[in-house]
Amino acid sequence: MTELLKLSAAELGAAIASGETSAVEATQAYLDRIAEVDGQIHAFLHVAADKALEQARAVDARRAAGEKLGPLAGVPVAHKDVFTTKDMPTTAASKILEGWQSPYDATVTERLRDAGLVILGKTNLDEFAMGSSTENSAYGPTRNPWDTDRVPGGSSGGSSAAVAAFEAPLATGTDTGGSIRQPAAVCGLVGAKPTYGTSSRYGLIAFASSLDTPGPIARNVLDAALLHEAFSGHDPRDSTSVNEPVPPVVEAARRADVSGMRIGVVKELSGEGYQPGVMQRFTEAVELFESLGAKIVEVSCPSFTAALAAYYLIAPSECSSNLARFDAMRYGLRVGDDGTRSADEVMALTRAQGFGPEVKRRIILGTYALSSGYYDAYYGSAQKVRTLIKRDFEAAFQQADVLVSPTTPTTAFRLGERIDDPMAMYLADLCTIPTNLAGNAALSVPCGLAPEDNMPVGLHIMAPTLADDRAYQAGAAVEAALRDKWGGDLLSQCAYAV
């Protein structure tokens, strides 16, 4: 069974389709792996073993009936616990939703089921996707499989840890300020933020509606592309959904060629203040692009220096509005409802006990930024910076086909190291936030281990809106070249590799 864990998602899907193995065998192999190691990693909040095997049997029955299966039919997937699932709990890693089960599936969930993927369960995250370390979960932190004393990044840390520990070949995540790319980078994985509006938010528990983007986490670029295509596309139930063809990311991942491509190195997203080992691996990756026939150009995006400040006004402002729905009246936790208290008192008690410290911090910050007398000075100014960032991206993409930077300024930090220092925590998303504010596409691919701590470093590849395929094409090219250089995948060096 261990041999099945070593297969890529594409290879596993092909093996199931050909009858070389079965969906049940693949699912059981991953369920056994979860039982073996998740006590140490804590990637999952809920494992749906019986339901997963039931889904797997249905895929095998379809094949036995002669039906042609899709490329990921029967392949297990771990699902971030912010996507609603009608047959298992959805908590957003918050006490306020403990035990709650949605009456409907999110579009991402629905499309994965339709594509025949087997949902193993729901993964841990920072509460309501607010955080960069998965330490803000009400159900305890997830640990990085490369070093269990370190964080797996966040907020999609459970999904990244599950894939890195070979508890799942694929996982879903959400990216609001870097919450897919950052954990993928520090866990030695591939993670993508699709163009905003190309992957549906219907059934996604909202953090910041103008920023939240579902995306894939995988062990290689092709696997990420296959998952990306499986759940993307227009959805009339999401008012922000883009009615455009899904960028051909699978085709681009298979092309894996950067000859003649213009690669723009963003001046403002590297250099001073970055961990030396991160900069070393990033510089080597840029040189590798050049050796593969790409043209390297330096680009400047001055507004990016204000991106972090703008994001931490815009995102909390939207969160303060979105989380108002958790009012102790309709669903979720209800505290103090003994008949002696008013509805307002019950609501206040419920929120006080149901929301964690980081969520409360962001609600307060957002409410202040939107308050009378401060709206223009804070939220209004942040939106103006957002416009400048979009313009800087547009200008940069006149000079380059894709832009690159490190994915994170440092490798994974130690558990507890930044939990009491919000500003230090927020800096983990320094390189990824501009892409969310602009809405364009980005991909993180592993580019080596930092010499100081032997922890993974991510290469961040940014592409224009609806040109996700460019990022995948460049990412696949550098991935193939590095695989040749290393003599295999970087993940084979992980402490939890099989």
Swiss-Prot record:
- What start-end ranges are recorded for coiled-coil regions in this protein? none
Keywords, A to Z?
ATP-binding, Ligase, Nucleotide-binding, Protein biosynthesis
Spans through the membrane:
none
Q: Which stretches does the entry tag as region Disordered?
A: 132-159
GO MF terms here are: ATP binding; glutaminyl-tRNA synthase (glutamine-hydrolyzing) activity
Show the catalytic activity.
L-glutamyl-tRNA(Gln) + L-glutamine + ATP + H2O = L-glutaminyl-tRNA(Gln) + L-glutamate + ADP + phosphate + H(+)
Q: Which GO terms describe its biological process?
A: translation
Q: Where is the active site?
A: K80 (charge relay system), S155 (charge relay system), S179 (acyl-ester intermediate)
Q: Which GO terms describe its cellular component?
A: glutamyl-tRNA(Gln) amidotransferase complex
Q: How does it assemble?
A: Heterotrimer of A, B and C subunits.
State the similarity comment: Belongs to the amidase family. GatA subfamily.
| Protein name as catalogued | Glutamyl-tRNA(Gln) amidotransferase subunit A
The species this protein belongs to is: Thermobifida fusca (strain YX)
What gene is this protein a product of? gatA
